[in-house]
Amino acid sequence: MTFAEFEQKYKDFDVMTASFEDELSYRQDQFDMFETEGFTDTFQTPYEECSEYNGQKYELVRRASYVKGDCDMECLPQWIIKFADGKEVNAYPEDICKLEVNFREIEEKKFN
């Protein structure tokens, strides 16, 4: 699913009022959309936590799962990634997804 397809499908969607099944479908489509749009080569978090890994390559291990206890449903999508030193972390789209990282860089340039 591309970003444009995702935007069209969910233009009137409200996650706060969605049924569990609809939210699950929404989260799956978020995963699909970000995976279709691609990942960055290096980790680049805007947050302080794990910022020591900024600029480092990572291995994509798997999708994070609320069923496996990786995170809460509302925190999805996230992916489990692994750094060269063996540390595994949950990564948000803004840490590793091209779409989000590029958007953030554009927004930061507007204000700097």
Regions found by a protein language model. Give the residues of each.
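Acidic, low-complexity, intrinsically disordered interaction modules
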Residues: 10, 15-104
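Short acidic DE-rich linear segments
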Residues: 109-112
